[in-house]
Amino acid sequence: MIFTLILVASLFSELHWRPIGPFRGGRTKAAAGVPTSPGVFYVGAVNGGVWRTVDYGRTWTPIFDDQPTGSIGAIAVALSNPDVIYVGSGEGLQRPDLSTGDGVYRSVDGGRSWKHLGLREGQQIPQIAVDPKDPNRLFVAVLGHPYGPNEERGIFRSIDGGETFQRVLYKDADTGGADVVIDPANPRVVYAALWEARQAPWENGEFSGPGSGLYKSADGGTTWKALTRGLPDFERDGLGRIGLGIAPSRSSRLFATVATKQGGFLYRSDDAGESWARICDDPRVVERADDFAEVKVDPVNPDIVYTASVVTWKSTDGGRSFTAFRGAPGGDDYHRIWIDPLRPATMLLASDQGAVVTVNGGATWSSWYNQPTAQMFHVNADNAFPYRVCGGQQESGAACVLSRGPEGAITVRDWQPTAVEEYGYAVPDPLDPDVIYGGRITRWDRRTRQVQDISPVPLRNAGYRVIRTQPIVFSPTDPRTLFFASNTVWKTRDGGRSWQQISHDLTRRMWEAPANVGKYRGTDPARPEQRGVVYALAPSPRDAAVLWAGTDDGLIHRTRDGGKTWQEVTPKQLVPWAKVSILEAGHFEAGTAYAAINTLRLDDLRPHILRTRNGGSAWQEIVRGLPGGGIVNVVREDPLRRGLLFCGTEQAVYVSFNDGDDWQPLRLNMPATSIRDLVVKGDDLVVATHGRGFWILDDIQPLREVTDALVGLDVHLFAPQTALRIRWNTNSDTPMPPDEPRGEDPPDGAIIDYLLKAGSEVTIEILDGGGKVVRRFSSGDRTEPVTDDGIVPRWWIRPARRPSSDAGLHRFVWDLHWPAPAALEGGYSIAAVPRDTPKEPRGPWALPGQYTVRLTAAGRSLTRPLTVRMDPRVKTPEAGLRQQFALSQRLAEALDRNTRLVEQVRRLRNDRPDDAALAALEGSAEERKPLVEEPQPALVPWNARLGALYSLLESTDLAPTPQAVRAAEKLLQQSAELSARAEKALATQKQMTPRVP
């Protein structure tokens, strides 16, 4: 596969991932504004990259998508030069569901380009502070590895714009920097918070230590002193994370959110940190203080204070009392507050739901339903048409999104929440797509919008353990059988009304702490004998009795008798708490399986995929070609091509053509983000990202077909997938505005993929079943640049398409229409799609049936069969469609004939503008009458009449009504007579035209 391996990354570069939503914001940790440019704000989603708005949050644009990471924890804009922006990667949190980063980035052109600066091993950067007077002087809080000790943590300083960093505050390899702020009145005064915390490898486990504390430097960060007077300490209070805020109008006043074992509290200092007092005892104000550590002070009034927590709170009395400023019953979970120093009523909030802006002090806010930064856990697709893509979204609940919108795009109308819990799976019933199973475990019915808990054990007990994500899988051999797992495996055949436990506890028998827990090993207060769960299930599509189960504590079991007995087949490569993230049962051999192993919780960022071909007796690691820092979350096998595998890492999708022996990137146009799950749905590859919602790669036939020999050919035509005749846009109303968020629909027609070894002129022809050429496209076709067309602005118009003649793989789309007839007036539907509205009239729809694609290039002519099928929702008999097509063809031909006659008349009239006979023959647009009235026997009025009736016939996939048929037959007869008279008159007129000697 060497040749293919070298070329495939560029070979498939024209394939295109399309985002489909949901457009509901996800966890956003970083936020900053630009005081000198009102309306400009930047936010960083924890796995969604960096976004900018220039219109106060009305729309958001990604500006970091070409970078190698999407996990963002901090953004800082230099006040003295707002073109200078610093980004810290890694979430900067301590929680069981996070993604790490790779250091600090800088832009010096307002986000148009980026440079990686360093601190790669820090993994998590929660805060960056830039000197308000010097854009090259900055401090970076580096939290460090969430699951292990490391040296690159603490507070770092740079005086050269990040070209070099110096660690200026450090405690030990277990303590990191949590916050850093610069005194706006005196930039040599810097405050910083250190935090000693470690995530446990099991769910919801966290350790802490005595390293946490608050520090101050008065000499620009060279030396530091601890600030302890009046603050909690670790031994007495269990001191944890600290968040800092300075009053810009009185910089001696500071506020601190402080986490302790008793809860979170707000402290205030009025002497520049020398002494502190707990100013507020309201537990709501600093709730979950290890998750939310944000306090900000109004830039003008030092008594107005805001804290970000489950709710955002506001105080007007210096922090003594608070009222809710923004929040919701479920908890929006706010992380960042930015207040415009020049306009304090303008604020930016970043939360688990996305980012919102206010310009009136919180009276109203922009929406977070315009940010495609959803953190999806898993993905499943139902069997409806078009199919829906479903999964749980972190913090917001589960959602299902149409894979194809009815209006030429996927809008807010095309997705809906599904009440099956935010975490984990949302699995449609294969026999009833309106029923969804999800969470831990519930059943939701779309028709009634009601949800029922169907847990095997409604009230948890010591023998029944579940965490936030539990596997839910239907049997691929019996669509009535549903599997669910806790620490054991369960099966139901009646939709969860009753359950059968089909396994014993499959997790580790004895509590074990891996080496990365380190010095905290003896501090776990619980120390239960068992704390793992079954995290992955994979029923075999080859053998109904075979089921694989993997645990989050590093075990794999297999049953070959439907769960009566289980055999442990754990690979020797697995260590305790190596999480079996996904298991995939082989589609071609019952003894084959693949396991994606996530070892982030072992402080191991390396990729791990295991393969067995003998039922688990032996396993082989298959990761060649995967990047060293690419933790693997999922691996899947294509059900049609043996050896074609896909995997998802923390940054991208990868593909293997040789059963995992070698991997290469399939990122294409997708931004770097955590790939949590993927499935093959028919000919499509559907992906759940944990920061950018769902994505679909349409028609993976080229991936199924590629071989070494194929890559070496001068030209190759791939087998087209079955094309569905679907109306691109069935909206009959005003379109959604272009600035409304939208996902992409599949290509509008038949996808034709071809490969050129070298540049060559290309011709693509579509032939019907009788060998007649339906359409012909050439790389030499003339295409005009898109401009305004009459009253239609250019941003609505679909550009003309022609086949590419460049070397490489190309994707061309035939829109399933015959050639368009010439018409005096073209137009665009009121139901337009931004940048994708075709001009009308188009040619008649091609009938469902068998066609041939013929590609001529590089001196060769290649053919492939193409099947066109009707939209499965349309039940019109074939005879009705044929009647419609025949009548439409005749009307199109008559319209074309009429139009060309008008053009001839107009050319003659250019030379003879006063010729009354020619003027009468042409007629005018003013003479057009409604269809119920007979127009004058002239070409232009009849052109409008033909065009109107043609459009009516082509507007639906139904047989024409009898009255439409009668009207068409009459019109066609009259048009033929008029055209014949016109042709005769033109011939006479041409004879009268004197010849030029």
Go through each PLM region and give its residues.
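Sec-dependent N-terminal signal peptides
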Residues: I2-A9
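Beta-propeller blade termini and top-face loops
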Residues: S10-E740, P747-A750, S779-R782, G790
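Beta-strand-rich binding/interaction modules
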Residues: T442-W444, I752-D753, G759-R776, Q850-R854
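Low-complexity, Pro/Ser/Thr- and charge-rich linker/hinge segments at domain boundaries
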Residues: P702-W728, P865-R897
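Contiguous beta-strand segments within globular domains
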Residues: T730-T763, L767, A807-V813, L895, ...
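Glycine-centered tight-turn motifs at strand-turn-strand junctions
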Residues: V773-P844
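Short acidic/polar inter-strand loop motif in beta-rich domains
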Residues: A820-L824, T856-R864
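Mature extracytoplasmic or organellar-lumen-exposed domains after removal of signal/transit peptides
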Residues: L866, R897-P997
